[in-house]
């Protein structure tokens, strides 16, 4: 299947970005920063502990905007949002660092992580080992690898780099073919994105269809389209307890209160 146009544009921009950033701060410098960064908080471990107790493990997203929806939150203070999520019962945070398409920032990740005790994933479009090392230098505990954006060799190289610098990996898939490729990686975390990259339509059936093909020892995170209690219950009944949710929270006045309402109503 051909790459969706928006993903093509993003990848083209990332190639430029890596060239710009590595010219500004050479890899050796970023590696030194990564070595001196505060210890990883154990992203996969935190999710697993929550899932094993059959409690919702929520990766709550700090996200200002998206290419399809525009600005989601005008009053955007990452530290405030992170604290609100922690109080609301989030297990981990996801912070968008992509500038051009999601109005994210590296600083947002640093501010959010400093404001709470939760493990944080750098949500960006990683195509080069430089960005993985950079994620650790920023203080991230985990990185996202999007199978649709990567070749197999590239994906394996990025996962190996993550392991070297002490980062967990969440590998994201959209269909069965991508899932087969993702299972080459050792990471326990498999993210199933319910949004079709070509049409932007969201269907929770994506998670339910792919679930039987995921080995039991892996931990499935369902991403996109969790909007109400019925969605949460549908997943839990199917044995999925890990969720990545952004938009539903970002549009709420108090993101953490919305998280609690959606996942911990009692």
From Swiss-Prot:
Pathway: Amino-acid biosynthesis; L-tryptophan biosynthesis; L-tryptophan from chorismate: step 4/5. GO terms for molecular function: indole-3-glycerol-phosphate synthase activity; phosphoribosylanthranilate isomerase activity. Disulfide bonds: none annotated. Keywords: Amino-acid biosynthesis, Aromatic amino acid biosynthesis, Decarboxylase, Lyase, Tryptophan biosynthesis. The keyword Cell membrane does not apply. CDD domains: IGPS (cd00331). This is Indole-3-glycerol phosphate synthase. It comes from Azotobacter vinelandii (strain DJ / ATCC BAA-1303).
């Amino acid at each position: 299947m051909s790459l969706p146009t928006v993903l093509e544009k993003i990848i083209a921009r990332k190639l430029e970005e890596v060239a710009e950033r590595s010219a500004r701060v050479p890899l050796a410098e970023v590696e030194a920063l990564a070595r001196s960064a505060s210890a990883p908080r154990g992203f996969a471990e935190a999710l697993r502990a929550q899932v094993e107790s059959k409690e919702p493990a929520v990766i709550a997203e700090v996200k200002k905007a998206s290419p399809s929806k525009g600005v989601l939150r005008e009053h955007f203070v990452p530290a405030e949002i992170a604290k609100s999520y922690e109080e609301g019962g989030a297990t981990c945070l996801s912070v968008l660092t992509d500038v051009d398409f999601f109005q994210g920032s590296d600083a947002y990740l640093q501010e959010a992580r400093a404001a709470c005790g939760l493990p944080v994933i750098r949500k960006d479009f990683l195509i080069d080992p430089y960005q993985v090392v950079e994620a650790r230098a920023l203080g991230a505990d985990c990185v996202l690898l999007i199978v649709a954006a990567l070749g197999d060799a590239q994906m394996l190289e990025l996962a190996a780099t993550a392991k070297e610098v002490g980062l967990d990996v969440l590998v994201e898939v959209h269909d069965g073919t991508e899932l087969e490729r993702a299972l080459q990686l050792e990471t326990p975390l498999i993210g199933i994105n319910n949004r079709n990259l070509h049409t932007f339509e969201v269907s929770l059936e994506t998670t339910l269809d792919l679930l039987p093909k995921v080995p039991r020892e892996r931990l499935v995170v369902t991403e996109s389209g969790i909007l109400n209690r019925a969605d949460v219950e549908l997943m839990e009944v199917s044995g999925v307890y890990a969720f990545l949710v952004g938009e539903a929270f970002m549009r709420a006045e108090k993101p953490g209160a919305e998280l609690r309402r959606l996942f911990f109503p009692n």
